[in-house]
Every structure is written in C-alpha cells, then in structure tokens.
Amino acid sequence: MKYLIVIGSGLTDRPIAEKDNRTPLEIADTPHLDQLAQKSLCGNVQTIPENFEAGNDVSLLSLLGYSPETHHGGTAPFDAVALDVPLAEDDLPLCCTFVQLQSSHNDMVMKDFTADNLPSEESRVLLDALQEQIGDPSVRFYPGRGPHNLMVIKSPAFSNTLNPPMELIGEGIRQFMPEGDEFKELVFLMNQSQIILHNHPYNRNRQKAGQDTVNSVWLWGNGRRQTLPPFSETFNKSAALVTSSLIFKGMGKSAGMDVVDIMGPNGNPASSFKGKVAAALKELDTYDTVYLHIEEIENISLKGDLDDKVLAIEDFDQEIAGPLLNALNCRDDVKMLFVENHVSSASLMKYTRDRVPFLVFPAQTGSQSAEGFDEKIVDSNKTHFKSGPQLIEAFLKDQL
C-alpha cells in the first residue's frame, strides 16, 4: 500500500457574522472536497499541543509525525537546512523577511508581510544591497523565496522568541520590537536596513509608479537547531515531500526525506497547483509515503481578504482535490490522508489553536463520513486525535 498525505494550509476558519455565520470553506463551491468527504472516514485532530503558539514550526512538524514537545526548533534553523547554509557553533540564523510598513502617528504599522508578493529576483536585488552595505563576517545574508530570506549573525541564542510578521497586519510594530541589551545589534540592523531600502533605486522607481515601497526587513524565527530521527526508521517507510515552503523543506531534509522542490514563475512558490499534484503522484511510483503540501491559501487568509479566500478555496477544489480524486479513483494501491495543519483565520488575521478536520480516502466499511469537508467535521462526534503524531501513526499503520 502507498500513502499520500496532503496538507492544505489556510482552508478552515472561524464563522463570519457578516456571512451569516458561515466560514469561507462553507461559502465556497467545493464539489470535489465534498465528494471526498462523502467517501472517506472523517475526523478531527489537535495539531498544536498545549503551551505552544499556533504556527507552521509546530503544526507541520506535528503532521510529519514528530512531537513538538520533543523536536520543536525555530523556523530559521530549518530554513538554513532547506537552503544548505552551513552554520558554525556560534552562528544564529534568523528569518529576514522584506515587509511594507506604514507610518501611523508615532508608530509604524505592518501593512504587508509579503511586501506586495515580492518576487525572488527583486528580493535578491534588495538583499544584495544589504549584504554589500551592512554585511561582514559576523552578518551574512542568504536568498530564500520571494520576500522570505535568511540572515546569519554571530551571537548567542536569544532568551526570547521573536515575533513573526504574518500575524501583525494592521498592528503597530513598536510593541513587538525586541528590547534589552541582547537585541541592540538586531534593532540596529533593522534600522540600517530601513535607511538602505529607502535610498535604493528599486524603491525610488516604486514611488514614481505610485506603489508602496519595500521599506524594511523583519527579523524573526530564532530557535533551537534540530536533527530529526529519520522518517524511514521511525515509520519503516520510504518518504518524499513535495512543497514550496522553506521550513517544510528543511524539516523533510532533516528527517532524511527526498524533497521535491516545486517552483513557479520568477522563482516564487508555484502558482500552478497542477504541477504539485503531478509531482506527488509521480513520487508515489518510487516511495511508500508522499507528502503534498499546498500553502498558498494561508497568506491570503492572514491578509484578511475573505472574498479572495473563497476564490482560492474554489481553485484548490478544482486544481488539487479534483485531480487527486480522479487519480485515486483509478488506483487501489493508494490511501490518502487529507488534513489542514492549523487554522489561518481571515476574520482574525491570525493563526489559531483550533482543531482541524481530516479525511482518509477511501473509507473502510462502516467509517464515519460527512456531507461536506468543512468545520462541521470538527464540531461533530467523529474520530478525534489528540495530536498530529498520533494521527500520522494510525494512518501509516492502517488503523484508519
């Protein structure tokens, strides 16, 4: 038997009052997801353990089958693994994300954590300017994906975890800036980056075109470095991972998985859902277990655009769920687990720790199905798992 694990980030949400207390997933037309739910065992899972904040660093690790309580590390260390950046003992990796800030009274407000979906090529131009003007043997910059890059500094580990920018839309940043002597150099580097970016020809051209400038970096993602136990030894199955997410790629490589790097136009994460589906189905010919991760809807959710989220979910249904349903209907040697890693709420513009729905296709005789794939699965008395690792173990051991 082959095992396909599909993680759809950003699908579920909280009920929205102005939408008759429906969620975007309930509003969207999703015939293929609903058909899957009707033919599957449906249940829910708590991917975020107690005492952990919701985020990809926790939920994706959980759905790889590794307990965050034991194996949690920072986003930046996994990004460094993904980018093959060597780290010395005294190196501290940090996520270095280009953002757009907006002046507001005596503060700056986070306007866009993707810097207007900054393409990788343009991000590289700005990153090169930072490396040239403030880089030295103790401060190094490495290009990543789109606005998301990596900075490595010579420093002891920080005592506090830095705030990620994804949940700060509309927030004044002053309250989230790190304080204390250990962060003085970090704040200095952020301030220097703003000066360099303000004077960069790229931003002058954006100003002339009436566009918001890419006027700051946001430094975050510090945490412990982790080497994960090999997936093949943990579950006695070979595995591949299809993703355009740096952190998930880093986790997969740390776990000894074969990582298929799917890129789209201009070096951005692939806009073509179909390319990811085709890659995952191809990997099933070689590997026992294949992970397929679709992350595009998450950023739309965190920007708070409900209508765009509904449209993105409908695209997901047509270009991910539909082709997968058609492909698996023609095979009897593949089981699929479809699950979300955590709630990315468009109404709150935040991650939440809410339980998320899952389905296992095809269902065994007598399994609990559902009329549609939405949040009602979470509220029903269907199969529940207390953690992601418990769900993954049960799925891979044919207990579902």
Q: What name fits each language-model region?
A:
Residues 1-400:
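Feature captures the catalytic ectodomains and active-site-proximal regions of enzymes
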